[in-house]
């Protein structure tokens, strides 16, 4: 929340979404947020795609979304238990589509212009640092997404 508030005025007055522990978004809320955004930020636990209904996601059209930042792949005891319970009901192929590369490809096919995503599991603190670096470089200094990611890699 601190990072969003810090860069709120520099980017847009129309930030929309769910922050903190407000509630768990419904599938309809996810779809509404995704289809009406020009940029999308996910900062959360486990795999981003595990929070969505895959069959509905593959049918979506998201051409307005120019940039999607997925700071996911964070694991806690509770999130691991939730994901394990959820994965029991899924096929191997369904779980495979939720991996980072496959998620980026799927989002690209739905119309998302650029995807910045983690490739490996990480911590909330490391994702907070990534978000700070990306926000500073994209919103304050106006760097391109490619340059901001390159700075992030260093």
Where are these regions (language model features)?
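Structural motif
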Residues: 38-43, 67-71, 115-116
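Glycine/threonine-rich flexible loop motifs
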Residues: 48-55, 79-85
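Active-site-proximal C-terminal subdomain of hydrolase catalytic domains
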Residues: 67, 75-154
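A domain-level signal for caspase-like cysteine endopeptidase catalytic cores
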Residues: 1-47
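Short acidic, S/G/P-rich loop/turn micro-motifs used as interaction or catalytic elements
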Residues: 19, 23, 45-50, 74-78, ...
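Alpha-helical scaffolding within the catalytic cores
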Residues: 26, 51-59, 101-104
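Short, conserved loop/helix-junction motifs that constitute active-site signature segments
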Residues: 57-64, 110
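Short, glycine/acidic-rich beta->alpha junctions
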Residues: 22-25, 49, 95-100
